Amino acid sequence: IVREVVSPAADQVETDALGNLLVTKRGKGENLPRVMIAAHMDEVGFMLIRDDGDGIFQFEVVGGIDERQLAGKSVIVGRQHIPGVIGTKAIHLTTPEERKRTLGSEQLRIDLGPGGSSLAKVGDRATFATQLKVAGPSILSKALDDRLGVFNLIQLVLHAPENVDLLAAFTVQEEVGLRGAKVAAYHFDPQIGIALDSTPAHDLPHFDGEENYRYNTHLDGGPAIYLMDGATIADRRLVRWLVESAQAEGIQGRSRARHRTG
């Protein structure tokens, strides 16, 4: 989908051995800054690791998933998008002690129903089956991390500035260790690198005042510019330029420092 949309506007489009889609859009002039902007195409999900029979599969989570919220979630499995549900022992069959404990993935199963074992196999991947919905000014969907970044990067390729050589990296395997971005950076050898991704909104009542101050992002508050995270400390000159550019264009935003990635 991404290749089809960006190819007419790009000077070069290629896919590397890892699966990254690497797009070059050259500016006008010589010796222009080489700016790589990355957004990841992968999403969190699951991998089937054991067939328990009767369409029931044990699975491992892939990426940063809150396992407390998995029971009862609908999923789709494999290239054929086989529908399934994540199930566990019925609540009325559990002991009071069991009800106090958080269910980990080892206690959950993906259930494809009778005959499901003939439709899927160990090694197949699964994702959430959530459908996009509009809720007033907001949208509800799975994988907005990082479909929002991918959408914005597509728009940047289609309306690229002419004063830089734009190196757009639509990457893979971000959710399991930033692997795609590392490979793309070695390929492009950019002078400047920027990642477009999502970040939590800390504007809910269960965050106390101190935590809201530390993580000051919130919905409708504009983009967040990371000062540091668990993998990098941003170049001060680049941060300053981003902040000043946003102010000059009247774009509200936030600066943020985070001790780890996710």
Question: Can you name each region flagged by the protein language model?
Answer:
Residues 1-262:
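N-terminal hydrophobic/helix-forming segments and targeting peptides
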